[in-house]
């Protein structure tokens, strides 16, 4: 086998996908009927040596859409009061329009083709983002409609943990339980965790992949 292929660009690392870390806080588990209340997004970048790191952050409190369910148990869990005017909440359209604009710029600047959502238990966050985009009639959704990177699964493989707080601690990161279930904090921790897993694989020699020598 020859030396590893020198693939250090973000567009090379994930076959043209542009990873964006997302976390949502909601008023329930049903993306079609329960309110999206908070969302944060962090884009990622690579340095010249191919190390992955967080880049740009956006964070919004979100107004419940008209007719949305607000499950008391969910509100008690995340501590959000949707009626609090100090939240400075914006519409689903405004929040996702801004996030999608940031993501599309990142895709273009990095030479990628499409965004891929990175999230902890990603099916949940992906379903709420897709449902909100549909309600807001946002046609230019940059995210893949079903492919995600789930840090719960990746953490189980790389660290032996699937809970976000435990995975962060296993990775040698700090995790403040008093800030958990804030979309901004959870997104920041998830972004650092994902970068650590990707970079750890690189440090261990798993990337770039070896390529066969020419005959």
Swiss-Prot record:
<dbReference type="GO" id="GO:0008408">
    <property type="term" value="F:3'-5' exonuclease activity"/>
</dbReference>
<keyword id="KW-0479">Metal-binding</keyword>
<dbReference type="GO" id="GO:0045004">
    <property type="term" value="P:DNA replication proofreading"/>
</dbReference>
<keyword id="KW-0378">Hydrolase</keyword>
<feature type="binding site">
    <location>
        <position position="181"/>
    </location>
    <ligand>
        <name>Mg(2+) 2</name>
    </ligand>
</feature>
<feature type="domain" description="Exonuclease">
    <location>
        <begin position="20"/>
        <end position="194"/>
    </location>
</feature>
<feature type="binding site">
    <location>
        <position position="25"/>
    </location>
    <ligand>
        <name>Mg(2+) 2</name>
    </ligand>
</feature>
<feature type="active site" description="Proton donor/acceptor">
    <location>
        <position position="181"/>
    </location>
</feature>
<comment type="subunit">
    <text>Homodimer.</text>
</comment>
<feature type="binding site">
    <location>
        <position position="23"/>
    </location>
    <ligand>
        <name>Mg(2+) 2</name>
    </ligand>
</feature>
<dbReference type="InterPro" id="IPR013520">
    <property type="entry name" value="Exonuclease_RNaseT/DNA_pol3"/>
</dbReference>
<keyword id="KW-0269">Exonuclease</keyword>
<feature type="site" description="Important for substrate binding and specificity">
    <location>
        <position position="77"/>
    </location>
</feature>
<dbReference type="InterPro" id="IPR005987">
    <property type="entry name" value="RNase_T"/>
</dbReference>
<comment type="function">
    <text>Trims short 3' overhangs of a variety of RNA species, leaving a one or two nucleotide 3' overhang. Responsible for the end-turnover of tRNA: specifically removes the terminal AMP residue from uncharged tRNA (tRNA-C-C-A). Also appears to be involved in tRNA biosynthesis.</text>
</comment>
<dbReference type="InterPro" id="IPR036397">
    <property type="entry name" value="RNaseH_sf"/>
</dbReference>
<keyword id="KW-0819">tRNA processing</keyword>
<feature type="binding site">
    <location>
        <position position="186"/>
    </location>
    <ligand>
        <name>Mg(2+) 2</name>
    </ligand>
</feature>
<feature type="binding site">
    <location>
        <position position="23"/>
    </location>
    <ligand>
        <name>Mg(2+) 1</name>
    </ligand>
</feature>
<feature type="site" description="Important for substrate binding and specificity">
    <location>
        <position position="124"/>
    </location>
</feature>
<dbReference type="InterPro" id="IPR012337">
    <property type="entry name" value="RNaseH-like_sf"/>
</dbReference>
<dbReference type="Pfam" id="PF00929">
    <property type="entry name" value="RNase_T"/>
</dbReference>
<dbReference type="GO" id="GO:0003676">
    <property type="term" value="F:nucleic acid binding"/>
</dbReference>
<protein>
    <recommendedName>
        <fullName>Ribonuclease T</fullName>
        <ecNumber>3.1.13.-</ecNumber>
    </recommendedName>
</protein>
<feature type="site" description="Important for substrate binding and specificity">
    <location>
        <position position="29"/>
    </location>
</feature>
<dbReference type="GO" id="GO:0016896">
    <property type="term" value="F:RNA exonuclease activity, producing 5'-phosphomonoesters"/>
</dbReference>
<keyword id="KW-0540">Nuclease</keyword>
<dbReference type="GO" id="GO:0005829">
    <property type="term" value="C:cytosol"/>
</dbReference>
<feature type="site" description="Important for substrate binding and specificity">
    <location>
        <position position="146"/>
    </location>
</feature>
<dbReference type="GO" id="GO:0000287">
    <property type="term" value="F:magnesium ion binding"/>
</dbReference>
<keyword id="KW-0460">Magnesium</keyword>
<comment type="similarity">
    <text>Belongs to the RNase T family.</text>
</comment>
<dbReference type="GO" id="GO:0008033">
    <property type="term" value="P:tRNA processing"/>
</dbReference>
